[in-house]
Curated annotation (Swiss-Prot):
The keyword Nuclease does not apply. The gene is FER2. Induction: By abscisic acid (ABA). Residues 1-45 form a transit peptide. This is Ferritin-2, chloroplastic.
Length: 253
């Protein structure tokens, strides 16, 4: 690192004509020796110079990394990438993976129901199939993140969903959409719980991942499905359900 001479030193160097050291070294100095050379001074570091004072070093990577080097696992089955990632966070992510897969499975059952020939609501079938794929995508995002942080993905059992969604009073369309709204709110609660686990364990990276990738999107999903429920309650079980289905099919709602 190069250091420019201060103005004070420049003035002294231009007017000094004597020999020897202008500033003799002392125990409290930085051990810099000033030697005259004609009309100039040469600055040299004496033996034993304090390099921190000379270079302004505030970070010594080879010293500070020693502690981290000691923490690098040597056994073949332990993650090398894991850092500041608690067991609680790892377990909570696995739980959220299971939530996303279960919700995806219910949506897939709804898709299969509305795609039947004796139900024939293709718009609802498309909506729930897209929803199923989206939730599965969320599960895969959490799996990828788990591996990225050095955790271990542990898939859990998925409950078998019901296959009949007709409702004598509400009809199948409204009943299914109310179920979807409840699932989205439940998913939001689970995401908030996962976020709180990150906060509790001072895992700012997990908190950022949940907040930036999921929480905002979850609010949008709840709002959209809430509007669908309100509209279906207005039209009842009659001919309006078919028109609503066509709007879903053509992405007009």
């Amino acid at each position: 690192m190069l250091h420019k001479a201060s103005p004070a030193l420049s003035l002294l160097s231009s007017g000094y004509t004597g020999g020897g050291n202008l500033f003799p070294p002392s125990r409290n100095s930085s051990n810099l020796l000033f030697s005259p050379s004609g009309s100039r001074f040469s600055v040299q570091a004496a033996k034993g110079t304090n390099t921190k004072s000379l270079t302004g070093v505030v970070f010594e990577p080879f010293e500070e990394v020693k502690k981290e080097m000691e923490l690098v696992p040597t056994t073949p089955f332990v993650s090398l990438a894991r850092h500041k990632f608690s067991d609680d966070s790892e377990s909570a992510i696995n739980d959220q993976i299971n939530v996303e897969y279960n919700v995806s499975y219910v949506y897939h059952a709804l898709y299969a129901y509305f795609d039947r020939d004796n139900v024939g609501l293709k718009g609802f079938a498309k909506f729930f199939n897209d929803s199923s794929l989206e939730e599965r995508g969320h599960a895969e995002m959490f799996m990828e993140y788990q591996n990225k942080r050095g955790g271990r993905v542990k898939l859990q059992s998925i409950l078998m969903p019901v296959s009949e969604f007709d409702h004598e009073e509400k009809g199948d369309a409204l009943h299914a959409m109310e179920l979807a709204l409840s699932l989205e709110k439940l998913t939001n609660e689970k995401l908030l719980k996962l976020q709180s686990v990150g906060v509790k364990n001072n895992d700012v990276q997990l908190v950022d991942f949940v907040e930036s990738e999921f929480l905002g999107e979850q609010v949008e999903a709840i709002k959209k499905i809430s509007e669908y429920v309100a509209q279906l309650r207005r039209i009842g079980k009659g001919h309006g359900v078919w028109h609503f289905d066509q709007m879903l099919l053509n992405d007009e709602v």
